[in-house]
Amino acid sequence: MANYTLAPEDEYDVLIEGELESDEAEQCDRYDTWALSAQLVPSLCSAVFVVGVLDNLLVVLILVKYKGLKRVENIYLLNLAVSNLCFLLTLPFWAHAGGDPMCKILIGLYFVGLYSETFFNCLLTLQRYLVFLHKGNFFSVRRRVPCGIVTSAVAWVTAILATVPEFAVYKPQMEDPKYKCAFSRTPFLPADETFWKHFLTLKMNVSVLVFPLFIFTFLYVQMRKTLRFGEQRYSLFKLVFAIMVVFLLMWAPYNIALFLSTFKEHFSLSDCKSNYNLDKSVLITKLIATTHCCVNPLLYVFLDGTFRKYLCRFFHRRSNTPRQPRRRFAQGTSREEPDRSTEV
């Protein structure tokens, strides 16, 4: 009788204990992204915002006032700086209280800036390849600038259309009694919607990583085949390629972490320790990726001698008479810069 009554109780106790252990294991080491986000996001994003806005506004000033917009690459570089500014404008507002409309506006600016930057990086690389392939004669000067304006408009429209799904399905995270525009958690993943979760993650991976990586790799290989007979010409493409490489290097870790986090069931990463590592890696890699907007102006300074010259002129005001240096610089740019594109 005792055995009959104790055995079920023992078995029942074991089952309860196993369930509790399972629940504890499931929740034991879940990484609290809100905690680290509250510590790092406000200070880091504010610093990146200040530095990035100042740097990119300086780039816009140099391009518009000194270098001019009579070359297609300058038009693309200007739009690239504007894309960075759109991205940067969202950073101070992450992890702060805000309603649904405010968060959706931030999401829209964030992804429009990110996608447009990807497109302009690809356009810059493609433009330099076409200039080299056709030795500067594939378009007349009169046709190049309108073509640059049209392709820039198409890139912006495409970036806006690509952002519509994120804008439509985003829901702000609920924390305590307030809504927060969450930076730490992937902002465009709607709750309990597996299809949208997979679709938007794949769209992010393809748009920001796979597509530009394919464009860059293909064009780089094609150009290297021809440049082996004239390595000196390769220096003309350092700036454009450096911008693309830095963009890919800074966004690749986040895209990989996001992909693994979204499809963790397919990679046997659903255990508690893997969830902890994935949540942590998504947040940290995203924080690193947001700093990319501050890097492009540094590349201009280190790799573009003309930009450095205009930058020194802007800060030091070396010219004695304002008109003659302007003519001299204008003639220098019209003689030197178009020659670079035609020599290639």
Curated annotation (Swiss-Prot):
The keyword Isomerase does not apply. PROSITE patterns: G_PROTEIN_RECEP_F1_2 (PS50262). Lacks the conserved DRYLAIV motif in the second intracellular loop that is required for signaling of functional chemokine receptors. This is C-C chemokine receptor-like 2. The chain crosses the membrane at residues 44-64, 75-95, 105-125, 149-169, 199-219, 239-259, 282-302. Residues 334-344 have a biased composition (Basic and acidic residues). Belongs to the G-protein coupled receptor 1 family. Residues 65-74, 126-148, 220-238, 303-344 are cytoplasmic. Residues 323-344 are annotated as: Disordered. One of its GO terms (biological process) is positive regulation of cytosolic calcium ion concentration. It comes from Macaca mulatta. GO terms for molecular function: C-C chemokine binding; C-C chemokine receptor activity. Receptor for CCL19 and chemerin/RARRES2. Does not appear to be a signaling receptor, but may have a role in modulating chemokine-triggered immune responses by capturing and internalizing CCL19 or by presenting RARRES2 ligand to CMKLR1, a functional signaling receptor. Plays a critical role for the development of Th2 responses. InterPro entries: CCR1-9-like, Chemokine_rcpt, GPCR_Rhodpsn, GPCR_Rhodpsn_7TM. It comes from the Eukaryota. Residues 1-43, 96-104, 170-198, 260-281 are extracellular. Keywords: Cell membrane, Disulfide bond, G-protein coupled receptor, Glycoprotein, Membrane, Receptor, Transducer, Transmembrane, Transmembrane helix. Pfam families: 7tm_1. Disulfide bonds join C103-C181.
